[in-house]
Each structure stands twice: as C-alpha cells, then as structure tokens.
A protein has these predicted regions:
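Low-complexity, intrinsically disordered export/secretion signals at extreme N-termini
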Residues: 1-52
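Short amphipathic alpha-helical segments that mediate assembly, nucleic-acid/protein binding
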Residues: 14-18, 36-39, 59, 80-84, ...
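Amphipathic protein-protein interaction modules
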Residues: 51-93
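Short, Lys/Arg-rich amphipathic alpha-helical interaction segments
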Residues: 89-110
C-alpha cells in the first residue's frame, strides 16, 4: 500500500507523463499538417504536366508523398524508380485506391 507521499509522487509522475504525451501528440499533428500542405503544394506543381492519364496522376502522387517523407530526392530518384513503379501499380490495380488517388488529384486541381 502506498503512503501519501508515494501517492503524490505517482500522481505527479502520471500528470507529467500525460502532459508529455499530449505535447508529443501536438507536435506530431503539426508535422502531419505541414506534410499535407507540402504534399498538396508539390502535387499542384506536378499535376498540370500529366494531363488526365490516371497512371501518371497516381505516379505523381506517389512521388510527391515519398519526397515529402524524404524517401526520394533529386539525387536518388533513379534508384527509387522501381519502388515508385511498384507502389503506383499497386494503387492502379486496386479500384478503391485508384478512385481515391484520382479524386484527391481532382480536388487539388480545383
């Protein structure tokens, strides 16, 4: 059984832990919001150059997402082309994912 001082210490620890978790959640949300904004900005610059070809639209979305996450860069794009193609193909052949990707692109282009 905990004495009063131990209970106070435990409560303080739990409060500090909760505050730390909430602060981290706010930081993650902020980073997420920044990533979405960067994704939309990059995609807005790419989409006008691909026309209405769904495969190219999906490919541009994949490339924008991977670049925002730092997975592909100007220096390694050739090395990552197989990964981009594999992800693009996966989305292209899944009707639900394809429709979602195209809908996102249309929304960004409006």
């Amino acid at each position: 059984m905990l004495n009063m001082e131990q209970r106070d210490q435990q409560a303080a620890f739990e409060n500090n832990t909760f505050a730390a978790v909430m602060n981290h959640a706010k930081q993650v949300t902020s980073i997420h919001d920044q990533n979405i904004s960067e994704f939309v900005t990059r995609l807005s610059g790419l989409l006008p150059h691909v026309g209405s070809n769904e495969e190219r639209i999906i490919q541009m979305e994949v490339m924008a997402a991977l670049s925002v996450e730092g997975i592909i860069t100007v220096d390694n794009i050739a090395e990552k082309s197989a990964m981009v193609k594999a992800i693009t193909e996966m989305i292209k052949y899944d009707a639900e994912k394809r429709e979602t990707a195209v809908a996102i692109a249309r929304k960004i282009m409006k």
